[in-house]
Amino acid sequence: MLAAAKGLLGHVPLYVTLQRGLGADRLRYRCLDELSLADGDTVIDVGCGPAYYFERLPRVRYYGFDTAPRYIEYARNRWGSDRAEFRCEVFGAEHLSQVPPADAVLLLGLLHHLSDEESRHVLRVAARALAPGGRVIAVDTCYEPRQGRISRWMSDNDRGEHVREPAGFTALARESFEEVDGEIIDDVTRIPSSFWLMRMRKPLH
């Protein structure tokens, strides 16, 4: 039953409806608010999914990457324009010459789907993609000591196979960034859930 429910999330309009119904959209909006983006900024969104939060952005130059064709097709049809580009590709070092340096890189709900080595690679490339003064922000399902039973169940049954404690995410980020900090978010979704919001600045490489 749980596997069937997860499979339904591949249906893009249903996924978007569920995200909003559960309050997960507010989690992403909180990340965007952290960045205080302005018109003309460049944003790279890795693992953008259907990018349903695009309408909350100012008039930025946006590059969204995801490996799910249905998500990218939805995003292109909805938001594609001369300032918003969506690519069904794995974001990597080869893209650094194709997009301008970023004022912000978004990793929203991505790292808990990636192994440690995959996460290291994404974080290294994200660090290299930043313009001077640029920032990376990530948010992921996490484990944390204060979790109640429902929240822990949500972490145990997340679609991501690499849900970590905050220290695990932070250790990976510190390999690529001089400044890393974060906070546990557990008050935005309608079902009790715990998330690690992580801010990264000053690339080491």
What positions do the PLM features span?
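A conserved beta-strand element that flanks and buttresses the S-adenosyl-L-methionine
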Residues: 106
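Hydrophobic adenine-recognition pocket in adenosine-nucleotide-binding enzymes
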Residues: 110
